[in-house]
Amino acid sequence: MFISISAGIVTFLLTLVEIPAFIQFYRKAQITGQQMHEDVKQHQAKAGTPTMGGLVFLITSVLVAFFFALFSSQFSNNVGMILFILVLYGLVGFLDDFLKVFRKINEGLNPKQKLALQLLGGVIFYLFYERGGDILSVFGYPVHLGFFYIFFALFWLVGFSNAVNLTDGVDGLASISVVISLSAYGVIAYVQGQMDILLVILAMIGGLLGFFIFNHKPAKVFMGDVGSLALGGMLAAISMALHQEWTLLIIGIVYVFETTSVMMQVSYFKLTGGKRIFRMTPVHHHFELGGLSGKGNPWSEWKVDFFFWGVGLLASLLTLAILYLM
């Protein structure tokens, strides 16, 4: 436990030092910053804010977790595969950000390219991580999927990777939402005695907390796709490594809600010839523009943050209660 906590503290302190240096480099190099949604007027002032900050906490967390696990004899197959997903999905996000920022390609990687790379990572993860006989845990009950587990694994990894990416649209929202989710999985890992996975979790929590100091409103830096895609893949990988896949539907309710809002909006728009359910999706923008109903007073980014963080925290506590108190 001491090693895991130490990894988190080291990552936190390193990120505190590295992020300001990253921002300074970004400014001096006159790199074009984040582009903003035209429909959210209050975001226009953020245009040009340095992005790709996720590269800093991602590299730092992965290296700290790797070396701490290695030198404490806690490096396992599961740790290796979680770090692999972080690196590969982070690379996908980096390529996406790179094309947007340096090549001026607004959409970055096209959907097919992004999906292909995410699926590749999922296949490799499936082949090497300790699966326990391709058993899917559904509310604590084992379901033997056999070969079909690979399809679930791919759906889980790609789905939650993109879901966290959609959540990253308000200052600080994604970073603390993931901290809350990882904290819940940290408890599960501790109870299961999987200290190797706990080490990786605490290392990333440390990095995210250090990053949040510069990412809360008004954000001085954004994580970019390099951070959000990696974090979503990490959550999915951890849920599978702990054999508690179903828990991510509750622990990750914020990401599920954000993604579902986009799917509902697109489907309803097509079916009705242009009508909308929400003022704007992902749904955090709906709250920004008109509060909970979409027709009231706009919510500040802090209010949106605390609403979603509160939902995520309650969902995480509910999950732990279901697992250990019922």
Curated annotation (Swiss-Prot):
**Keywords tagged on the record:** Cell cycle, Cell division, Cell membrane, Cell shape, Cell wall biogenesis/degradation, Magnesium, Membrane, Metal-binding, Peptidoglycan synthesis, Transferase, Transmembrane, Transmembrane helix
Bilayer topology annotation: Multi-pass membrane protein
**An example Gene Ontology molecular-function term:** metal ion binding
The biological pathway it contributes to is:
Cell wall biogenesis; peptidoglycan biosynthesis
Q: Which GO terms describe its cellular component?
A: plasma membrane
Name the protein family. Answer: Belongs to the glycosyltransferase 4 family. MraY subfamily.
Name of the protein this chain belongs to? Phospho-N-acetylmuramoyl-pentapeptide-transferase
As recorded in Swiss-Prot or TrEMBL, the protein's gene is named mraY
